[in-house]
Each structure stands twice: as C-alpha cells, then as structure tokens.
Regions:
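Short glycine-rich anion-binding loops that position phosphate/pyrophosphate groups of nucleotides
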Residues: 84-86, 109, 191-193
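Gly/Ser/Thr-rich active-site loops/lids in small-molecule metabolic enzymes
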Residues: 165, 175, 179-223
Length: 319
C-alpha cells in the first residue's frame, strides 16, 4: 500500500491498483450475504478479492482462492468477517507484514470490530480512498521450539485438571522478580487486558501504552497480584521442577503441553497490528458500554429483556 498522511499522525496506507482485498472469515458463521456485498462493491470499483483456499466451500463466486502465503503477499488490506476472534486471527496472519485490517461484526460483544454489515459499502469507500485512521496494536511474541508464536490478546500457561498447579519464576531484564503458584498465568497485551487477564482481576491498559500485564489466576502462594511491565523489558517465565504440565495457549488456542523445567521468553512487538478505525470516538464509546456490561450478571443479549418496552408509534397515513 502507498502511504498517506493523516493530519501528521500515523501514516494511513491506501490501496494501490495492483493490490487485492484479502478476506478472512469466521470458521462457522455463514458469511455469504456479506461476501456477496463485498464482491459486488469490488466489481464496481475494479478491485480483486482473495481468500484462503481452505475456505473454498464457503466462498461464493467472485472470490479467488489462494494459498495462505499468497494471501499474505498480495493483500493490501484484510477484511475480517466475524467477531474479535476472527479479527485476532487476521492480525496474526499479517503480523510479519502488517497491513490495515478492517473488522466487520458478525458476532456479539467485541472490542476490535467496528463496522456493521449494513455499513460495509461506505466503509469500503473510505478504505479505498484512505479516509480512515490507523489504531496500532502491539503483539506478544515468543519463540517456541524454533517457531515464532504471535499473540495479540494473550499468552497463557493454564493448568490441566489432575496435573498440578502452574509453578514458575518470573524474570525481568535477566533478574528474578518473583515466584508464582496458581491455576494459570496470563501474559496480556494492552488490547488483551480486556479479555482473560481482566477476568482474572488484571487492570485495563490503554492500547497507546507499550506494556504487558501478567495476571495469576487463582493464586495459591507467591505473587498474588497482577503486574504491569514495560514492553521494553524482556521477560521470561521458567517452570519449576515441581510444577504441573500446563497447556500453552496463544490467543485462546492450545499449542502444546509444557514440561517442568521449561522456560518461555516473551517480548512485546510494537505496531505489529494495524486496525482500521472509521469513527474512533464512536468506537471508544461503544467499547466503554461493552466493558461495563462485562461486570453485570447477564449476557449482553439478555440486557434487552431488562429494558422498558415501548409501544411503537402509530404510522401516519399518507395524504
């Protein structure tokens, strides 16, 4: 993508003629109506839409099926159709080649997605002309068995029933900083501070801050409070020999089981994700409302039943 200035702030990329729109879809929800709207817009604007060939059975005509590597190489921007989980997958997909990712909400409660399906055409017009802002997101990166793992929400060491608790030593800047014994340890990015870490009692951290939050879940002994650590400080977690064998989770997906004595080194990668924002103030207000719902003893959709019902106004007959 070419780069345009956004009032002297974060440079805003704009699509070049030879770049395609990449599509990332929810693994279960039917995306057909929204994809058809997207391909219709693309035809009328001379744009090409590509998607992972593994989703071929769920893609209508007008979308080129390509390999994951080709999708990453050719996409000038990604359109994520789903909720926050789909959005996280899209961000991870292009973490080594960040391009703007626009989230279209096909889910329920979300903090990353912004665009509603009925707003898609107008949103694509703005994406095409560079009339948007970029919200930069950091990622937590660890190297595991020569494989680099990227998390935009969190990395967690979660105990497995019957396997014993997680027992680990935290090292910051090469110095031991404390010991944990708990059911799970969560290393969260700023955006991930609204997820698993928040449920464990961790603080909310502004996306503008380069920091990680380490939150113990159900601590038994050792450090029992969350800690906020600068993203510039390399940190490591080393499992003690009498620790259980926890599951290593990256953005909620189990990657493998860890063994006592193993250690993980985690670093924060700033500006690893570029999220498209069309109305940052409106999105912030929505996020504040959504965040307040998390502390209520109801599911978001159940809140509608608590609102007073109003009679619909009578239709005024045409004259």
């Amino acid at each position: 993508m070419s780069m345009a200035c956004d009032d002297g702030r974060v440079p805003v990329p704009t699509l070049t003629p030879d770049e395609s729109l990449g599509l990332v879809i929810h693994p279960r929800n039917d995306p057909t109506p929204v994809v058809e709207k997207l391909t219709s817009w693309a035809r009328s604007h001379g744009k090409h839409v590509i998607a992972d060939a593994r989703d071929h059975a769920r893609l209508p005509d007008g979308v080129e099926r390509v390999s994951e590597a080709e999708l990453v190489e050719r996409a000038g921007a990604l359109i994520s159709l789903g909720g926050d989980g789909t959005m996280l997958g899209a961000l991870r997909l292009v973490a080594n080649r960040p391009v703007p990712v626009m989230g279209v909400n096909l889910g329920h409660l979300g903090f990353l997605v912004e665009v509603q399906p009925q707003e898609l055409d107008a949103a694509l017009d703005r994406l095409n002309t560079g009339n948007f802002t970029i919200e930069e997101h950091s990622a937590a990166v660890l190297t595991d068995e020569s494989d680099e793992l990227v998390a935009f929400n969190d990395i967690a060491l979660a105990s497995v029933p019957g396997e014993g608790s997680v027992q680990a030593v935290l090292t910051v800047m090469g110095r031991a900083s404390g010991r944990y014994r708990c059911d799970a340890l969560v290393i969260a990015t700023p955006i991930g501070s609204t997820a698993y870490s928040y449920a464990a009692g961790g603080p909310l951290v502004s996306p503008m801050l380069d920091a990680v939050v380490i939150s113990p879940v159900a601590p038994i002994s050792g450090i029992s409070r969350p800690a906020v650590i600068s993203g510039a400080e390399p940190l490591a977690l080393a499992l003690l020999e009498d620790s259980g064998r926890p599951a290593l989770q990256v953005d909620g997906t189990i990657r493998r089981r860890m063994a006592p004595g193993e250690s993980l080194e985690v670093r924060l990668r700033p500006r690893a994700g570029l999220v498209v924002r069309l109305d940052p103030e409106r999105h912030q207000r929505r996020s504040e409302v959504k965040l307040s719902l998390l502390d209520l003893p109801f599911l978001p959709e159940e809140m509608r039943d608590l609102l007073p019902r109003r009679e619909a106004p009578a239709l005024i007959p045409a004259t």
